[in-house]
A protein has these predicted regions:
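Short acidic, glycine/serine/threonine-rich loops at helix termini
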Residues: 58-63, 114-117, 183-184
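Beta-strand segments within the central parallel beta-sheet cores of soluble alpha/beta enzyme folds
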Residues: 1, 47-52, 100-107, 166-176, ...
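Phosphate/pyrophosphate-binding loops at sites that engage ATP/ADP/AMP, CoA/4′-phosphopantetheine
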Residues: 91-98, 197-208
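Condensing-enzyme catalytic core mediating Claisen C-C bond formation in acyl metabolism
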Residues: 103-104, 133-200
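Generic structural marker for isolated residues within well-ordered, non-membrane alpha-helices
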Residues: 6-7, 88, 198
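Active-site-proximal alpha-helical scaffold in enzymes
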Residues: 23-53, 81-118, 153-160
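Conserved catalytic cysteine-centered active-site region
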Residues: 2-50, 54-83, 122-145, 172-179, ...
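Charge-dense, low-complexity intrinsically disordered segments
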Residues: 75-78, 96, 185-188
Length: 216
């Protein structure tokens, strides 16, 4: 949300002077794709891709509300948590998932790590379901804590990758898909773009996918 915030990031990673620096808007996924293309075209042999989010620089729920349609949605100030609540309610009413399944996700997360906010862990699903709603049907444990974070990945072309690592992980392809952001224009309980990407990536054999990370 802050103009030219990438400049401080370049200072942090020590790229002085940066040999070949490029920055993209939106998220690090686009930066990853740009670096991937540069490797494929032979412009570079290696690339450091990084992305970061600094939610503490502003009021995140207000910022995200201002990214919605300025005529029909933004005047209502629906923040991301409220819209996630709409999506959760649609899924519950349609029988796509249950409140117990939602609580199980939170319980599994608590078993792996503590949260960065004041939300306390629980020992059972019933304990979580007894907690009050924050944005019905969401409780605080259903909502990701607002935090600052960063991620990075090093890409290398074929021979260079084998030189740097005995068993490197390979990127086999990318799929670009998008769905309308207009509230009410699509079914919030399904994601056609995710389904189409999975089919394209596997040649239609989606059952071969062992692990998938899906985020929004």
């Amino acid at each position: 949300g802050r103009a030219f915030s990438f400049i401080s990031a370049i200072d942090s990673i020590g790229a002085v002077p940066p040999i070949n620096e490029s920055h993209v808007e939106m998220d690090a996924a686009w930066a990853l794709y740009e670096a991937y293309i540069k490797l494929l075209t032979g412009q570079v042999e290696t690339a450091l891709v990084y992305g970061f989010g600094k939610s503490s620089a502003g009021t995140l729920r207000r910022v995200l509300a201002m990214q919605t349609d300025p005529y029909t949605v933004a005047p209502l100030w629906p923040d991301a948590v409220s819209m996630a609540g709409l999506q959760a309610r649609f899924g519950l009413d349609a029988g796509k998932w249950t409140a117990e399944q939602m609580a199980q996700v939170a319980l599994d997360s608590f078993a792996v790590a503590e949260r960065t906010d004041s939300e306390k862990p629980a020992k059972s699903i019933d304990e979580l379901l007894a907690r009050p709603y924050f944005a019905d049907p969401l409780r605080r444990h259903d909502i990701a804590p607002i935090t600052d974070g960063a991620s990075a990945i090093v890409l290398a072309a074929g021979d260079k990758a084998r030189e740097l690592r005995e068993n490197p992980a390979w990127i086999t392809g990318f799929e670009h898909r998008i769905e309308t952001p207009v509230l009410g224009a699509r079914d919030l309980t399904v994601s056609p773009s995710t389904e189409a990407s999975a089919k394209a990536a596997t040649g239609g054999d989606v059952g071969s996918i062992e692990v998938a990370e899906i985020y929004a």
